[in-house]
Every structure is written in structure tokens, then in C-alpha cells.
Amino acid sequence: MSEKNMEKAGVVKADELDEMIDETTGGASTVNTVGIHTTYLISKGLQNCPLKPTTILPILPRK
């Protein structure tokens, strides 16, 4: 995957992500880092995703 495509897809390099997390959290504890990593990647992915979360909701099974 080329660097440009990765940027478009919202893929962030681990070291860049660590820097962003440090800026956001003031250096979170390592225990929490994985959660923040995944949350960050998911939110980053959703921002770049052409589908908005509202378009996904109707597909979910109703109770």
C-alpha cells in the first residue's frame, strides 16, 4: 500500500499514533494504550469512511 493510499484510508503509523496519543492524553498508561489505539483508529476510519454511521444502523437486527 503506498503512503498516499494509506493516508487516504486513515492508516496511521504506530510512532505517529503514539505521538498523537501522548498529545491527547499527556502520555497515557500503557494498559490503556491499546484501547486508545483501537478507538483512535476506528474514529479515524469512520471520518474517512464514505458511509456515515447512520447508514449502517438500519442493517442492525431489531430486537
UniProtKB/Swiss-Prot annotation:
| Compartments, record wording | Secreted
Keyword Nucleus carried by entry:
no
Key words of the record: Secreted, Thioether bond
How is this chain modified after translation?
A: Maturation of FlvA2 peptides involves the enzymatic conversion of Thr, and Ser into dehydrated AA and the formation of thioether bonds with cysteines. Modifications are processed by the flavecin synthetase FlvM2. This is followed by membrane translocation and cleavage of the modified precursor. Contains DL-lanthionine, when coepressed in E.coli with the flavecin synthetase FlvM2.
Could you tell me at which residue positions the Lanthionine (Ser-Cys) crosslink is annotated in this chain?
Answer: 43-49
**Where does the UniProt entry say this protein principally localizes?**
secreted
Origin: domain of life: Bacteria
Q: Which GO terms describe its cellular component?
A: extracellular region
Residues that make up the propeptide are: 1-28
Residues modified as 2,3-didehydrobutyrine are 30, 33, 38-39, 54-55
Known role: Lanthionine-containing peptide that does probably not show antibacterial activity, since its analog [+3]Flvbeta.a does not show antibacterial activity against M.luteus. Also does not show antibiotic activity when tested with [Del2]Flvalpha.a, an analog of Flvalpha.a, which is encoded by the same operon than Flvbeta.a. The bactericidal activity of lantibiotics is based on depolarization of energized bacterial cytoplasmic membranes, initiated by the formation of aqueous transmembrane pores.
What is the protein's given name? Lantipeptide Flvbeta.a
- Name of the gene this protein is made from: FlvA2.a
